[in-house]
Design a protein with these regions (language model features):
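Soluble or luminal CAZymes and related metallo-dependent hydrolases
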Residues: 24, 70-84
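Short amphipathic alpha-helix
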Residues: 19-32
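Nucleotide-activated donor-dependent transferases that construct or modify glycoconjugates
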Residues: 1-18
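N-terminal strand-loop element at the rim of the active site
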Residues: 9-12, 29-72
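Short, flexible loop segments at the rims of nucleotide/cofactor-binding pockets, characterized by
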Residues: 18, 67-74, 91
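Short N-terminal targeting/anchoring amphipathic segment
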Residues: 82-93
């Protein structure tokens, strides 16, 4: 199956600091890749994965050297990237 994994942008996948959701996204993504699914991860560029990575922002928002006052623009970009490629996937998760 072609699966899109859509991660929060606050932490990298897997997280360098606290990030329960991002850790679960990482576990699930790596297991799906191990089961020979074609997995694409939409996440921050500092994420590490065996899946295809579509970087949404340069670094996880919480780790950015420039304070992120409003994360809405980053999430709009995430949704834009997913929407443009949605037809390529069997599952969006």
């Amino acid at each position: 199956m072609k699966i899109a994994q859509i991660a929060p942008l606050a932490e990298s996948v897997p997280p360098k600091l606290y990030g329960g959701t991002e850790r679960i996204v990482s576990f699930l993504t790596e297991e799906l890749v191990g089961m020979n699914h074609d997995v694409t991860l939409f996440a921050s560029a500092d994420s590490r994965t065996n899946a295809r990575l579509v970087p949404v922002c340069e670094v996880a928002l919480r780790l950015s050297s420039r304070p992120v006052v409003d994360s809405v623009a980053h999430y709009v970009r995430l949704l834009e990237l997913v929407f443009k490629q949605a037809h390529e996937f069997d599952i969006l998760h």
